[in-house]
């Protein structure tokens, strides 16, 4: 009888780690309840608020123009994998099992038909490649379970952007993703580190809801590059702004009466103490005139919040 009790106790202990794991497989729909402007139309030019960027990143962002994405050779390029934290697409997560043992070899996160590559999170203990190994749009990710959270460490991403207004991300950046499921809600939190462009880590998150319709695309549609702007047909044409020539450098700051150092981000702007430095330098606008109610700044009646 004692032997049976010991065997039963050991079986419970052995099963505990597996029991803590959560099934993430399925279709997940994006929840558009935060930062509708950032994840919809896109951030304002010159808006680097909330980013712990350094001077090099700021200067690179101020020379950026969205016309560069319209170049024929860039029209079908993916965003890097940090885009999963700022995009509005749905995703599909698949479990890849060993056909013999049934162990989980990897988790695959689809791109949801968007402009980023799928993510494969390896769970079989394989090491990360050399620091000098080639980069890819999918990066290289390995995962482990911490309680009921899947934690994935990603390296070897290509150079990309932190925001769609040109804030850069270097190919030396790494990202830690936390997948947390609460019933029908899936939260993905990302911690981004970049020794080239960030002075501190950047933390972002995205929420998804289980999608019973199952209509999230498993793969991206075929992309056919073409010249979107006739002016880009000229060989050697690369859209850009030379330092100090970007006409939108101060548009965001002026619209919201922000001092430039507040609009241009940086580590010091992330902390509450920075508010004290704005005393006497910042006057809030009298009323909201943009993005006041829903994405685009219009309520369902077609009026801005100011007009109601």
Regions found by a protein language model. Give the residues of each.
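Sec-dependent signal peptide recognition
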Residues: 1-7
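PEST-like low-complexity, intrinsically disordered acidic/proline/serine-rich tracts
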Residues: 20-308
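N-terminal signal peptide c-region/cleavage motif recognized by signal peptidases
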Residues: 15-17
């Amino acid at each position: 009888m004692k032997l049976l009790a010991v065997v039963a106790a050991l079986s419970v202990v052995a099963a505990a780690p597996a029991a803590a794991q959560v099934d993430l497989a399925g279709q997940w729909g994006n929840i558009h309840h935060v930062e509708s402007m950032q994840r919809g139309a896109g951030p304002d030019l010159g808006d680097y608020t909330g980013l712990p960027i350094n001077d090099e990143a700021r200067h690179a962002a101020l020379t950026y123009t969205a016309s560069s994405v319209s170049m024929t050779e860039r029209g079908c390029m993916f965003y890097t994998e940090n885009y999963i934290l700022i995009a509005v697409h749905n995703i599909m997560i698949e479990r890849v099992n060993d056909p013999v043992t049934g162990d989980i070899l990897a988790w695959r996160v689809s791109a949801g038909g968007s402009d980023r590559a799928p993510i494969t999170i390896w769970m079989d203990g394989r090491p990360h490649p050399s620091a000098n190994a080639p980069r890819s749009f999918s990066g290289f990710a390995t995962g482990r379970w911490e309680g009921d959270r899947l934690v994935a460490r990603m390296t070897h991403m290509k150079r990309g952007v932190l925001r769609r207004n040109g804030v850069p991300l270097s190919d030396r950046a790494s990202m830690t993703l936390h997948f947390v499921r609460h019933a029908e809600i899936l939260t993905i939190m990302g911690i981004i580190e970049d020794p080239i462009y960030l002075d501190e880590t950047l933390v972002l998150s995205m929420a998804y809801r289980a999608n019973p319709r199952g209509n999230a695309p498993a793969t991206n549609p075929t992309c056919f590059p073409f010249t979107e702007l006739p002016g880009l047909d000229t060989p050697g044409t690369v859209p850009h702004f030379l330092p100090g020539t970007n006409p939108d450098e101060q548009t965001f700051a002026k619209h919201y009466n922000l001092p430039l150092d507040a609009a241009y981000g940086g580590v010091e702007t992330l902390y509450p103490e920075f508010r004290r430095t704005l005393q006497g330098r910042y006057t809030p606008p009298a009323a909201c005139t943009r993005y006041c109610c829903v994405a685009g700044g219009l309520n369902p009646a077609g009026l801005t919040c100011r007009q109601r």
